[in-house]
Amino acid sequence: VDREDLEQLVDLSVVCTVSSVDTGLALNAVAENRSTVAEAHIQVDTGLGFGGFLISEPEKILLAYRSLPNVALSGIYTQLHAVTGKSQEVDGQLGQFQQVLEAIHQAGFETGTVHAAGSFALMHFDDARLDAVRAGSAILGRCRRTKGDGLTTVGYGEASITEVRWLPKGHTVGADKLIAMKKPTRVAVLPVGYQNGFGVERPRSQSLLELWRAWRRSRNRTVRLNGQRVRVIGSIGASETILNV
């Protein structure tokens, strides 16, 4: 753990994560040196593997509650992982997490705010909505989805064309894979690209069928121009897209 980063987090009163005894001790030392108390949540690993106390080592979690006088442990969380949206995928993880919570309570400590659901779990598993949820990719509009999830389009983006011109037969366009014009073509430049989120999507699953469908959609992408659908030519660039007008 970088001490300078911890010092800045403590100075800004950021709610930190304690994912191990070592990170807890490091945060406690910084807070003690500044004569303050840092706020943090305990992270528990129920199988995702990104970090946190292992569920098989509850004694280490209890050590964090007992040994960090300058850290106020105001919450505890895990990150549920699921693929299909079926409840049995997360039932076991929630059960393991609940066992950790019970061990903490039996030792006489309060868990504070308990949370386990990211965006996918938030939308698919009612039991995962505990004291709080962490809606990240759902807010960005790029959350992994399942069929029949009830989500509907709530808006659209608008941009002005920056240039219209003719390209001769044989001229190429595209950011990644060049496409040659088969005939003289009138094109327009749209000042929007993948850095704006255009064309960025997550398949509903990683199955070959869903990946193939996503590939087909990318080859037939359109935008609406003056009430008419026009096709995108070539791959979408970082900040520009070419339209066939």
Predicted features and spans:
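Active-site-proximal beta-alpha core segment in soluble small-molecule metabolic enzymes
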Residues: 1-116, 129
